[in-house]
Amino acid sequence: MAWLAALLAALLAAPWLANDYLLTVLIIILYFAYTGQAWNIMFGFAGQLSLGHAIYVGLGGYAAAALYVHFGIGPWIGLMAAVALGAVCGAIIGFLAFRFGVGGVYFAILTIAFAEFARIGFDHFSWVGGSGGLFLPVANYSQSDIWNLRGKPIMFYYVILALTVATFLLCHVLLRSRVGYYWQAIREDEAAARALGIDTFRYKMYAVVISAGMTSVAGVFFAFYYNNLFPEQVFSIGRSIEIILGPMIGGAGTLAGPIVGAFLLTGLAETMWELLRAVGLDAPGTRQVFYGLVLLVIIIVQPAGVWPWLARLLGLEKPRS
């Protein structure tokens, strides 16, 4: 698609035209676009609502950061450990839920419970800092070391851009594969999908494990970008809500929805924050209030999300039925 190529070209050129603040905002936008796309596999494609996705961010971040801090193992090797840990955790949650028929809102509650268990557990896990947090060595910002993910913000920008593009392409392939068609059948009517001979347990497990593993990668990026991890920070319900806002606003179940939602939500939030700060109204919690208001408006005006409406308006893509 021509519009996708144009967007990618703009994103590739953006760091050379943006100041430090705008570059930071773009990194945050792409981070939420990536995590939103990973969550979109579980809910948007397969219809399994997770409200505890922060557990995978936390597990991935702690796995890679602990290996780096304690053993000097680089983040790219640590990333493999992070993906494995996240996927195993997702498999455990999925197996317990789907084997015993836990679905819908009860599955969502189960995911929150696991995230809370992880938060409490890591609060008392002294090897990774406990409640005091785990800190990575301060990076040398005069140069970039891609192998150790240490260096200038522009390096992190291109890393998260590459991850976001790769995830978009992977989801494009998955959605148009047999697995993707089975996911959509399960999402629309699981009983009917089962009656047609689809192994719903297996394909729901695929969705959970893939989504969990991909989200764990975001945890690695988070740890090395911010240089610290706190259980209250990475396992919180607020972190999970931040992940799902992009696809919910942009359009869950669509490929472009999480990206559009991340740009719209984070871009508007930062603009609003700057305007409020200019007049001295930058009170704590302002962003969260703004997120809630935007989500409320979208649910009322465009419950399917912004992207289906925008795609229909511009003739870019057929709306999802």
Language-model features: where?
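Transmembrane alpha-helices and adjacent helix-loop boundaries
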Residues: M1-S321
